[in-house]
Amino acid sequence: MSRTVFCQRLKKEGPGLDFQLYPGELGKRIFDNISKEAWTEWQKKQVMLINEKKLNMMNLEHRQLLEKEMVSYLFEAGEVAIDGYTPPSQ
């Protein structure tokens, strides 16, 4: 049986992640407070962000930028701004 969490991003109960996907205290916070649905949404945004901004994950500054965007998106209800992208609903 999967575990249930109250997702801070979606503000509703949902299935939690199966295991901690990110290291450290932030990873624990994500595991305890973010649902699979919200994590999947973040992964899509993350791929777009990496591609559009041409981020190199070997570069510490780029990883820090991505982590900052992740925290904003998952916990502060921030949206990922991607230049030139218009969501399908608009």
From Swiss-Prot:
Keywords: Iron. Disulfide bonds: none annotated. One of its GO terms (molecular function) is iron ion binding. One of its GO terms (biological process) is cellular response to oxidative stress. The keyword Iron applies. It comes from the Bacteria. Signal peptide: none annotated. One of its GO terms (cellular component) is cytosol. The keyword DNA-binding does not apply. Gene3D superfamilies: Fe(II) trafficking protein YggX (1.10.3880.10). Belongs to the Fe(2+)-trafficking protein family. Could be a mediator in iron transactions between iron acquisition and iron-requiring processes, such as synthesis and/or repair of Fe-S clusters in biosynthetic enzymes. This is Probable Fe(2+)-trafficking protein. It comes from Aeromonas salmonicida (strain A449). The lineage of its organism: Bacteria, Pseudomonadati, Pseudomonadota, Gammaproteobacteria, Aeromonadales.
